[in-house]
């Protein structure tokens, strides 16, 4: 066997399209909540691959599922079905409101499918219907949301920095103010086919929806015959301490999108819905080559069965408290956070006015001390670690984070 091509961080700059600016080290191995780089330096992982590695790195049962399926069949295409995809569909149906599932490969694809379904359902059921004024194809989304990078989903996202360079954008999308029901009510009409919302805005700053807001959206969608879509790409599969965040609120969507943690690190996504809405997508109306891939579904089935247990879900809530206590101690020392918010193990630390705009500085300094974290905009440090991270790793990670914060504080005062 030929020796692997030697690579360094500089190789990224030479060979990769620069849509990202990764850290200056290369991770080569992971186990549990710990990562190691090419030089053997260890890092506690508070990022979880952006809320993906829900069971940490190298979980033995997940690895075994992948190897077992790899010895059977890898890929078939959508002209044939397979056992893992059917079993995973049944698991999701049994665990949620859903009656039908569409599998794809990423959160953006799942949201794209959800929005297409909503427009198709409206076309099939309301076009030329007596009393219907105008075409029913408008989509209501919310400012500072994030729904993916396809042209359709990035247009729904409500963050111009991600969409403004790709005009002309798809039309028929308007954006209300998140957590402002009056703003939504002014936009949702009988011409609205869908409302798409995150129960917690992840990229938008780890901002949870108010219960009254989501209940109000449900009522408005019912009144105007609009499809209510919950984007649970980041909040789903145990991240908040329930299998899906809608379960906290007692608000059931018509369509739910899931990705990230669903595969525990293996790319897979799903759109969940009921028979009523699924009927809008018939043979040939939508599709994907890799969706329902046997390898992905075998892994996801194992991930879902491991997470959807009382022990793991209650453990997420317990770990949330461990984080809050540790972060409060850090803030008592350094006074950098104005607010700590989120649910379960999706946590956002909002920087106060003295440190506004320094979220990237903090995570870069923290990395020097062996902790990997995320940002959610310039003013929010975000954590989305493994759902089964140990108390020891949380304490050690927060200690390393504190060293990074101290470094930023010293620099700010010098």
Swiss-Prot record:
It comes from the Bacteria. It catalyses: N(2)-succinyl-L-ornithine + 2-oxoglutarate = N-succinyl-L-glutamate 5-semialdehyde + L-glutamate. InterPro entries: Ac/SucOrn_transaminase_bac, AcOrn/SuccOrn_fam, Aminotrans_3, Aminotrans_3_PPA_site, Class-III_PLP-dep_AT, PyrdxlP-dep_Trfase, PyrdxlP-dep_Trfase_major, PyrdxlP-dep_Trfase_small. It is an enzyme of class 2 (transferase). Its cofactor is pyridoxal 5'-phosphate. Pathway: Amino-acid degradation; L-arginine degradation via AST pathway; L-glutamate and succinate from L-arginine: step 3/5. The keyword Transferase applies. CDD domains: OAT_like. Disulfide bonds: none annotated. GO terms for molecular function: identical protein binding; pyridoxal phosphate binding; succinylornithine transaminase activity. Its EC number is 2.6.1.81. GO terms for biological process: alpha-amino acid biosynthetic process; arginine catabolic process to glutamate; arginine catabolic process to succinate; ornithine catabolic process. Transmembrane segments: none annotated. The modification N6-(pyridoxal phosphate)lysine is found at residue 260. Keywords: Aminotransferase, Arginine metabolism, Pyridoxal phosphate, Transferase. Belongs to the class-III pyridoxal-phosphate-dependent aminotransferase family. AstC subfamily. Catalyzes the transamination of N(2)-succinylornithine and alpha-ketoglutarate into N(2)-succinylglutamate semialdehyde and glutamate. Can also act as an acetylornithine aminotransferase. This is Succinylornithine transaminase. It comes from Yersinia enterocolitica serotype O:8 / biotype 1B (strain NCTC 13174 / 8081).
């Amino acid at each position: 066997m030929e020796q692997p091509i030697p690579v360094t961080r500089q190789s990224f700059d030479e060979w990769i399209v620069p849509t990202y600016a990764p850290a200056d080290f290369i991770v080569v191995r992971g186990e549990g909540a710990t990562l190691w780089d090419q030089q053997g330096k260890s890092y506690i992982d508070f990022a979880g691959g952006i809320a993906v590695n829900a069971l940490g790195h190298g979980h033995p049962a997940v690895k075994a599922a992948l190897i077992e399926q790899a010895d059977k069949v890898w890929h078939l295409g959508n002209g044939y079905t397979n056992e893992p995809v059917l079993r995973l569909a049944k698991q999701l149906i049994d665990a949620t409101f859903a009656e039908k599932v569409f599998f794809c490969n990423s959160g953006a694809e799942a949201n794209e499918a959800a929005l297409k379904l909503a427009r198709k359902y409206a076309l099939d059921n309301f076009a030329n219907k007596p009393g219907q004024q105008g075409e029913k194809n408008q989509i209501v989304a919310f400012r500072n949301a994030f729904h993916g990078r396809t042209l359709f989903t990035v247009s729904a996202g409500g963050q111009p920095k991600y969409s403004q360079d790709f005009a002309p954008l798809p039309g028929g999308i308007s954006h209300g103010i998140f957590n402002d029901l009056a703003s939504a009510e002014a936009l949702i009409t009988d011409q609205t086919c869908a409302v798409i919302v995150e129960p917690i805005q992840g990229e938008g700053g780890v901002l949870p929806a108010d219960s009254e807001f989501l209940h109000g959206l449900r009522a408005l969608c019912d009144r105007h015959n609009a499809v209510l879509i919950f984007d649970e790409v980041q909040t789903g599969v145990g991240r908040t301490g329930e299998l899906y965040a809608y379960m906290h609120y007692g608000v059931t969507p018509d369509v739910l999108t899931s990705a990230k943690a669903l595969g525990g690190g293996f790319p897979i996504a799903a759109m969940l819905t009921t028979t009523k809405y699924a009927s809008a997508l018939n043979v040939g109306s939508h599709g994907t080559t890799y969706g329902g891939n046997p390898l992905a579904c075998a892994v996801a089935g194992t991930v879902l069965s491991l997470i959807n247990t009382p022990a793991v879900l209650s453990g997420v809530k317990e770990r949330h408290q461990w984080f809050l206590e540790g972060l409060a101690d850090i803030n008592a020392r350094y006074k950098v956070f104005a607010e700590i918010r989120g649910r379960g193990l999706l946590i956002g630390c909002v920087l106060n006015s003295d440190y506004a705009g320094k979220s990237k500085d903090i995570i870069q300094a923290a990395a020097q001390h062996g902790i990997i974290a995320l940002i959610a905009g310039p003013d929010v440090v975000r954590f989305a670690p493994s759902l089964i991270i140990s108390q020891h790793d949380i304490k050690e990670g927060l200690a390393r984070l504190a060293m990074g914060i101290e470094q930023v504080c010293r620099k700010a005062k010098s």
